[in-house]
Structures are given as C-alpha cells and as structure tokens.
C-alpha cells in the first residue's frame, strides 16, 4: 500500500512539473543556488507556490469531474499511520473491496432506475432551465402570439392547475388537518360502565291526569287520531251509509254524485282502518315512528282535506237528502191524514208533473219529489195550527205588570246617577276644583323663549292678588 501510494505521488509530481515546463536543467540550476531573474516566476514564488500553481493549472485543464474523482482518490490514498502489512494482502483486500463497491453501485443504480421508472412523468422536472423562468404574461410574449394561441395557453394552464389541485386533494390524510396534535393534548376521560336501570311504574296507581300527561309526552298525535277516528266513524254511520242506501234503492240516480259518495265512503273506511292498525301497534308497545303506516295516514289525511272543498259545496244538498229520508221514514210509520181543503198545486209539484212527461225521467226521482212535497205540506199545516193556538192564548191572557210594579221603588227619593259610583264622583269633584283653582291662582309658566307680550291680553280691571291675612 505504501509503495503504491509513493509511486502514484511520484507520477503526479512528474506530470505537474512537465505541465509547468520544468526540466532537469532547471532543477540543477535551482540546486546550484543561482539567484532568479526578475522576469522568472521563481523570483516571486518558491517551490511550494510553484507546485500549487502548477497543480491548479492542471486541475483547470482536466475539468471539474476529473478533479473531484482525483480528490477522492487522493483522500483515500493519504497515509497517516503506516502499517507493516504485505502488499499482497492489501491488493487482495482492495480487489474484494472494489468488487463489493461495484456490486453496490450496480444495485444502487438498479434501484434508482426502478424508482425513476415508477415516478409519474407529469411529476418529473423539465430538461430546460428556461421553462422555470420568465413569464408568458408580459407584453413582449403576448405581442408575438395570436389571440387563439394565448387562449390555448390559458386553457392548458387552467387544466394543469385543476390536475395539481386534484392530486393534492387525493394526497391529503387525516394528519394533514391538524387534529392529531389537539387530540394528543386532550385529557383521557375515564369511561364508566353504568348499569342500565329501568324504572317500572305501576300504572294502576297512577292517576288519569298523569297517564294523559305521559301519553302526550310519548306520542302527542295519538289523542288527535283517536278523536279523528270517532268523528269519521260517526260521519260514515250517520251520513254516508244512509246516502248509499238511497243510491242502492234508486232514489239518488247514478252519476257523479253517487260516485263521489262511494269514493268518500271507501276513503273514510281505509283511513279508519289505518288508524286502528296504529292503535294496535301502540297497544303492543311497538315503535311506530318509522313505520309505513304513518306515511299512509298522512296520505289519507291530505286526500280528505282535498275533499273538504267539495263537501262545503254539497253540504246543503246532503242535509236536504237526509232530512227527506227521515221524513219519508216517519211518513211510513204514521198513517196518511186526509186533506179537507183543496189547494192549488205548488210550483215544485207542477215542475215534477212536467218532468214526468219526459221519456228519460227516472221514476225514483219523481217519487223523491212527491215525498218532499208531502213533507213540506205537513210542516206548513203544523205551523198554521201553532199560530192559531198562540193567538187564542194571547186573547185570554192577563195584562202584564208595569215598570213601577216590577221595581217597587215606592216613595224612594230620586238620586243622581253619579252618586252610585263614589270613585267617579270624587274624580269629577277634583276636576272642577282644578278649574276653580286656575281662576284664582295663576299657573307658573317657565320662560322657554323671550317674553313677547301677554298671549291673552291685559285687562286693567282684573285683580288676581292674594289678600294678606
């Protein structure tokens, strides 16, 4: 190792001296000790300076790449503490080390090539430094480009910015939002496993008021649905079923009216059936908040609300039909009374007779009109009888008592109305006293503005002074 390094040092020294232009004669002259001439470089420099200057010239000639490799070789071959070791062992060791270094270099280059191949080409750096300097927004570059090229470049820049933004968003993780360091300082909260305690109430001992309160808190819509169920069932029983019986008997002709009655009847029954199902769920303590029956109830409620407009229009006719049916039932139960007087036919009866001449007129409608006329005639007769009886009672009745008899005041003196209320009496007394006081003593008037004369004028005969006592 020592011999090899010495040989390399001698070779380098010879190369440096050859490049510096020194020969053996120059060395001999130096050895003779003759003084150098002023034009010679040795006049200002010694051998050490010449050596370093020659070495720097050689370095500049070779280039920076060779300089770095040379410096590395020099650093490696610099000997500090020499050891007496055979050159053969050193050469074997160096050869093995060189092989290992070569293998390491091959492995590192293969790993580096694989890493470079796995990198996305869009993320790699460019080959020209000019790409990362200057700008295309200047007036010089814009003047040399057409409007179409400028718009194309702007569009490409916008697309590139969007791609970068998406890539950065995909690379974000939970740690990037800065929540982890906050959680690190958070104090751990001890979790206590609490046993679930269920309080069983004896409903037999709870009052009705408390039960209603609990029911309203648990399901406030339950009471409203129960009331709605009762109302709809009553309407079905008292109104819709009798009208449908008239439709079946033929009293009400088939048409839109009968179809409307059937639709309303079926709608009410379905609505009541869904409410009953909801009540069954509540009785079995099944949670019904997410059950489909709630949605079905809302649908039926909306349809019923839409029918309310039609119900208002047809309410008078439905009431008339129901009263007509009640009158017909009563008429069947009581025998017909013979009419003693013959009266002219009414307009409705004449219209009914006229309608019988039409071939398409239904006999059920004619029967309905006749029943309605008979009922109105009976009602008119009852009103006449009641009016005659009332007139007879008024003729035989006694005279009514007078106001004086009813009040029975006797010789009570007349009193003012204001005396009945002491508060109002004293209030009125105070108001009159203030008026009298205003005439006796002048009110204090503050000088909000400069004096401009008497507002009401000055009367010489008026004296408002107070007498001394």
Swiss-Prot record:
Disordered as annotated region, ranges: 17-44, 62-158, 410-469
Residues recorded with modification Citrulline: 375
Biased composition, class Basic residues, residue ranges: 412-439
Tissue spec: Detected mainly in subsets of neuronal cells of the brain. In the 17.5 dpc embryo, mainly expressed in the olfactory bulb and cerebral cortex. Postnatally, additionally expressed in the cerebellar cortex, most strongly in the hippocampus.
Superkingdom per UniProt: Eukaryota
Coiled coil segments of this chain: none
UniProt name for this protein: Something about silencing protein 10
Organism: Mus musculus
Gene encoding the protein: Utp3
């Amino acid at each position: 190792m020592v011999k090899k390094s010495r040989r390399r040092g001698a070779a380098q020294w010879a190369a440096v001296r050859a490049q510096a232009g020194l020969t053996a004669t120059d060395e001999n002259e130096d050895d003779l000790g003759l003084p150098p001439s002023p034009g010679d470089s040795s006049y200002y420099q010694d051998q050490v300076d010449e050596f370093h200057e020659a070495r720097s010239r050689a370095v500049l000639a070779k280039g920076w790449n060779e300089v770095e490799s040379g410096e590395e070789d020099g650093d490696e071959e610099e000997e500090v503490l020499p050891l007496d070791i055979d050159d053969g062992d050193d050469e074997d060791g160096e050869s093995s080390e060189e092989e290992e270094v070569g293998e390491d270099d091959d492995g590192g280059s293969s790993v580096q090539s694989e890493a470079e191949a796995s990198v996305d080409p869009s993320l790699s750096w460019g080959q020209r430094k000019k790409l990362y300097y200057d700008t295309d927004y200047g007036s010089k570059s814009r003047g040399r480009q057409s409007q179409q090229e400028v718009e194309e470049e702007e569009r490409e820049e916008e697309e590139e910015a969007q791609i970068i933004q998406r890539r950065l968003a995909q690379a974000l993780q939970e740690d990037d939002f800065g929540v982890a360091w906050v959680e690190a300082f958070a104090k751990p909260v001890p979790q206590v496993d609490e046993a679930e305690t269920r309080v069983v109430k004896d409903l037999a001992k709870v009052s009705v008021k408390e039960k209603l309160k609990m029911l309203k808190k648990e399901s406030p819509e339950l009471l409203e649905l129960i009331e709605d169920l009762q109302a709809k069932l009553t309407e079905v029983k008292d109104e819709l079923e009798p009208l449908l019986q008239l439709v079946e008997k033929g009293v009400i002709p088939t048409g839109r009216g009968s179809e409307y009655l059937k639709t309303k009847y079926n709608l009410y029954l379905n609505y009541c059936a869904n409410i009953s199902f909801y009540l069954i769920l509540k009785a079995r303590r099944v949670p019904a908040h997410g059950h489909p029956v709630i949605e079905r109830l809302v649908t039926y409620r909306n349809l019923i609300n839409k029918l309310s407009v039609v119900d208002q229009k047809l309410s008078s006719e439905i009431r008339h039909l129901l009263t007509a049916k009640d009158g017909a039932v009563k008429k069947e139960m009581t025998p017909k009374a013979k009419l003693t007087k013959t009266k002219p036919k009414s307009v409705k009866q004449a219209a009914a007779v006229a309608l019988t001449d039409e071939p398409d007129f239904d006999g059920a409608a004619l029967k309905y009109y006749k029943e309605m006329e008979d009922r109105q005639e009976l009602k008119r007769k009852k009103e006449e009888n009641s009016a005659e009886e009332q007139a007879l009672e008024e003729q035989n009745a006694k005279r009514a008592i007078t106001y004086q008899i009813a009040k029975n005041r006797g010789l009570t003196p007349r009193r003012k109305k204001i005396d009945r209320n002491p508060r109002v009496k004293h209030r009125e007394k105070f108001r009159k006293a203030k008026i009298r006081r205003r005439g006796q003593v002048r009110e204090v008037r503050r000088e909000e503005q400069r004096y401009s004369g008497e507002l009401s004028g000055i009367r010489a005969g008026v004296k408002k002074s107070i007498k001394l006592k």
